[in-house]
Amino acid sequence: MNSAKLAKILEDHKLWVTSLHESGSRADLRDANLRDANLRGADLYGADLRDANLRDANLRDANLRGADLYGADLRGADLRGADLRDADLRGADLYGADLRGADLYGADLRGADLPDHTFVIMGEKYAITIENGEYVRAGCQSHSIEEWRKFSKQEIAKMDGRKALKFYPRLIDIIDFYTGKGERPDWLKSKEYADEVKEQ
């Protein structure tokens, strides 16, 4: 697809989103060849991207919330920081995609081919995504596994107060289960921490 046509579709889509569907038109990019496209930061909220070729596309920080990406080819795509909440990714090929910091909360991933060592864990206090076996997103916090294992009590408390402090051991258990047992900070074993958690 040529860049002028794509720019027009994105412009009409932005108007459609901001006018609450009163004007403009929803982006219809079904079967579109967007291989290597630079869509960094694009607002594709609710867009139709079924079966689109987005291989190696730059979708960093893109808004793909509620987008229909059924069967899309996203191999090697840069999806760092992308908002994929409630997106339809059924049957999508995400092999080799970079999902660091991407928000997949509520995304339908049935039949999707995810990058190696990528897991989406539902049913916890926070939505959790383990990305490429290296990064973990819990709620709105995304850090390397090594960083999660070394955070101080104060750093965890700054994330979401007592709720985060109470959940932190569970998060480390989840990381251990999916990526292998690793170190834990000493403060987790302290009597002070145990007493603080009991008070809640």
What are these regions (language model features)?
Residues 151-155, 159-184:
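Domain-scale recognition of modular recruitment/scaffold domains used in eukaryotic signaling
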Residues 99, 104, 109-153:
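Glycine-rich hexapeptide-repeat left-handed beta-helix
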Residues 7-10, 126, 170:
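A generic structural signal for ordered alpha-helices
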Residues 1-85, 90, 95, 177-200:
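Extended, small-residue-rich solenoid/repeat segments and analogous flexible loops
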